[in-house]
Amino acid sequence: MSSSSFVWTVGSIALSSLITPTIADGSGSRYQLTEAWQGEKFLDHFKFFSGSDPTNGFVTYANQSYAESSGLIEVTESGSFYMGVDYKTKLSPNGPGRDSVRIESKEYYDEGLYIIDLQHMPGSVCGTWPAFWSVGPNWPYDGEIDIIEGVNKHEANEIVLHTSGSCSLSSENDMSGTMTSSECGESSGTIGCVVKGQDGTSGAPFNEKNGGVYAMEWTSSFVKIWYFARSEIPQSITEGNPDTTAFGTPMAHLQGTCDFGERFKSQKFILDTTFCGDWAGGVFGDSGCPVSDPSNPIQSCVNYVAENPAAFKEAYWEINYIKLFQTGTGHSTASVASQAETATAVASNTVDSIPSVTSTAIPETTAPAPETVSAEAPATSSAVPEPANPQTSVAGAETTAAPAPSPETTAAPASPSLDDSDGADAVSETTIYVTETTTICGASTQKGTIQTIGGGETEVSPASSTVESAATPAAPTPTSQKPVASLPGTTVNGGTPVPTDVSPETPAEETAGESGAPTPSAEQPEQPQPAATSIETGTVPPAVSNPAPTEQGTPEGASPVDATESRHDSDEPAPTSAAPIRSPSPSSWTISSSSRVASSSSFASTTSSASRTTSATKEATAPTETDSGASTGTNPESPVFTAGASKSVGISGLTGIVCGIAMAMLA
């Protein structure tokens, strides 16, 4: 960098350090607009005072609705705000006072520059006391500033300050007005410190000049108030960028021994017109007004106001605007932009095919929240919408995790994912075929003993099982020798079927072998199991476990839907001829559910209804032996996959058939 450039840089910094403080301290351009009260929005910043007059005036302050309906307030065609008094009604001096309006700002404001542009103020009328002023919430400790005030035939504005204690002002400050009282504190009475402006700054002379502007600059050191006639308004004000340094000599420069920052706190602004009262009534006889009772000037004022309504037609305010300016702020008041964030969670349950899990129906439980259950099984999952009114959950305090499938078990074919319609009800219907068989001998199964339950039904009591019966009045459900997975499209002990899109032409793959893992399930309230006893005769458990028709309603119009088939194989060779099957026609149960389905590894469903139909054309056939040595069953016309159907042909059933054939051969 050259030496000349360095000199210029240092010089610029030095010059800016000298100029910047001067601008910041003395230039009115530091004021920026924060609020503008005008036109239709003028009353948005005010509330109406309708209480009794604190100055004991002969006045009735109207609320907003009455003021609007009676024409006391309105927005003019030019956009100015009109606020007048009743000038039509003759009153009784002993009755309520004349209708008028008093409005107060909704908020309190701090130090700044406040400008009011008046087209008209209440004229020089006997008995009137108009004022535009500010006051703190705790008078007199928070101070009062009377910006515009006059009484009776006033033609010169009077500016007054009120403070607590003692606050003396200097009369040596440069101002165009005349200080008539220098003590602002209440200690010297309620007069306050007063500066009287020149004639023509108030009342009728002010209005004859088409009004003008009053500006108040309030700081922690002083209060200055300027008056500008319409033709003398500074250009910086009309341009919206007021510069108080160019305003010239103020009407009042109020500054003295007291700390203004302590004596004047946050202020609200008030605009009103009252009649008579302590000041206007007290000096009524000294203002050249007609006195009806020389001994009582206040009563003379009341008599005049009550009996001469037309005299107050000019006692109105017409305001073009009130603007608030403060330092260091922008045109708009500061606001915090809040950004609302919303997160939408799509609840769904994901269920994987788990071959070694047995599901148990629970009559009525509730689910605290949807859950996702996934086991290490090579099967695809399908999303199920969350139920609108969840009524299912895993019973008990603990849930047994689903073990991994055994090596001999192959996964069921992949089920297509359901069409998740975000809240649409899932409708699933399943047809279950019931086949009744009869054996002529009792036999012990590999893991349990067939025992009589009652009503011609039997139950297998497992020798070792982790499943506990639910304490419900539902019909007993035979326990499957091989736990079966809860797949989409299945019903569990009469529960709500899981919807599926698998076509009947795509049956599930066969399950080869047995899993040596224990059968986990949802823990249920304990119920004693019947003692295991051997029987000589009995019936094979029904092929399907379904709800009792007497306990559950039967929906009408139910129809079967596509589902996958369940086939259980046995290591025992299939007989060449089957035992007699006492089934004139298979029983078809159509289970319909229109509620949303909730699924988990330990499936528990709400109560579903079943509709029973009978078909004489669909007959169950005996299982036949395959090349692999496993027995298979002939599929019904509409194959289904249910927990009950998985128990229709098991080791216990085949054992009974073999025993029957053996006894027939011995005979």
From Swiss-Prot:
Coiled-coil residue spans: none
Composition-biased stretches (Polar residues): 379-394, 623-637
Signal peptide region: 1-24
Top-tier EC class: hydrolase
Enzyme Commission code(s) on record: 3.2.1.6
Entry keywords, A to Z: Carbohydrate metabolism, Cell membrane, Cellulose degradation, Glycoprotein, Glycosidase, GPI-anchor, Hydrolase, Lipoprotein, Membrane, Polysaccharide degradation, Signal
Hydrolase as UniProt keyword: yes
Bias-annotated ranges (Low complexity): 397-417, 448-480, 488-502, 517-534, 573-622
InterPro entries: ConA-like_dom_sf (IPR013320), GH16 (IPR000757), Glycosyl_Hydrlase_16 (IPR050546)
Subcellular location: Cell membrane
Residues carrying sugar: 63
Domain GH16 intervals: 25-288
GO biological process: cellulose catabolic process
Lipid addition sites, GPI-anchor amidated alanine: 643
Active-site residues (renumbered): 144 (nucleophile), 149 (proton donor)
Main location (coarse class): membrane
Chain spans, region Disordered: 361-424, 448-647
Entry GO terms, CC: plasma membrane; side of membrane
Membrane-topology descriptor: Lipid-anchor; GPI-anchor
Domain of life: Eukaryota
GO molecular function: endo-1,3(4)-beta-glucanase activity
SUPFAM superfamilies to which the protein is assigned, alphabetical: Concanavalin A-like lectins/glucanases
Similarity comment text for this entry: Belongs to the glycosyl hydrolase 16 family.
Role, per record: Mixed-linked glucanase involved in the degradation of complex natural cellulosic substrates.
Protein name: Probable endo-1,3(4)-beta-glucanase AO090023000083
